[in-house]
Design a protein with these regions (language model features):
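Accessible peptide chain termini
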Residues: 1-2, 176
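C-terminal segment of classical bacterial N-terminal signal peptides
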Residues: 2-10
Length: 211
C-alpha cells in the first residue's frame, strides 16, 4: 500500500485583473481529485501535462487521453490529447480543451428577458518535453486560446514552462511551473485582458507501508 503526499505553493494574479480563467480549471477527474492543479505527481496520465508540461516525459508513447466532466450547473468540460516520443529523451504532444457554459438569459436595460445567449472557451496547445538528465525533465507548451460570448469573440496566446526533478529511489518529485505567460491578441472591446499568470512550486512523496 502506498500513500501520496503533496505540497504546493502558488503565486497568481487576482482573478478580477485577468481573463481566460478557465485555464486554471482541471481538465480530468484525476487532476480534480489531486486538488485541481497538481504539478509534481509522476504518473502515466497525459492529462497531467496540462498542469506542468515537464510531466509529459513520464507518459507512455502514443497515448490518447479523452476527458469529459460536468462543471457547475449547465457547464461542460472536455479535453483530448495525444503524444509521441522521439528517441529516449524527447516527447511531443498536442491537446485541445473546451468548456461550454450553457445557455444564459439575455436581458435589456430594464432587466426584461429578450432571449438567450451562450458562452464557451477553447484552448489548442502543442507540447514538448525533454529529459535533461536521468532525473530532471523540462517542458514547454504553446497555447492558442479563444473565447466566445454571444456574438463577441476574443483571442489570446500563452506559454507554459515547467521543470520536474524525480528521484525514483526515494519516490520524491519536485516541480516548478510558470503558467500562462502571454497576452490577448483580440479583445471583446477596447479593454485587453491579461492571462491568469501562475508561478507554482510543488512536491510529491509516495510513502509505502503506511496505514
Amino acid at each position: 500500500m502506498a500513500t501520496l503526499a503533496n505540497i504546493a505553493a502558488t503565486r497568481a494574479q487576482n482573478d478580477s485583473q485577468t481573463g481566460y480563467n478557465f485555464l486554471r480549471l482541471p481538465v480530468s477527474a484525476h487532476a480534480a481529485a489531486l486538488g485541481g492543479d497538481n504539478i509534481s505527481v509522476i504518473d502515466d496520465d497525459e492529462a497531467l501535462m496540462f498542469s506542468n508540461p515537464a510531466l509529459l516525459s513520464s507518459v507512455t508513447d502514443k497515448s490518447l487521453n479523452l476527458n469529459y466532466m460536468s462543471y457547475m450547473q449547465g457547464s461542460k468540460v472536455a479535453s483530448a490529447a495525444f503524444n509521441k516520443t522521439f528517441g529516449e529523451r524527447a516527447t511531443a504532444a498536442v491537446s485541445a480543451s473546451y468548456i461550454d457554459y450553457g445557455k444564459m438569459k439575455e436581458t435589456d436595460e430594464s432587466n426584461v428577458q429578450t432571449g438567450e445567449f451562450s458562452a464557451k472557451d477553447i484552448s489548442i496547445a502543442g507540447y514538448f518535453s525533454y529529459l535533461l538528465t536521468d532525473r530532471l525533465s523540462g517542458g514547454v507548451s504553446a497555447k492558442f486560446i479563444t473565447s466566445y460570448i454571444a456574438d463577441y469573440n476574443s483571442i489570446a496566446v500563452g506559454v507554459d514552462l515547467g521543470l520536474n526533478y524525480y528521484d525514483p529511489d526515494r519516490e520524491w518529485s519536485l516541480s516548478l511551473a510558470l503558467k500562462n505567460l502571454g497576452g490577448e491578441l483580440k479583445a471583446y472591446d477596447e479593454d485587453y485582458n491579461r492571462l491568469p499568470f501562475d508561478m507554482q512550486i510543488g512536491a510529491s512523496k509516495r510513502f509505502t507501508n503506511m496505514p
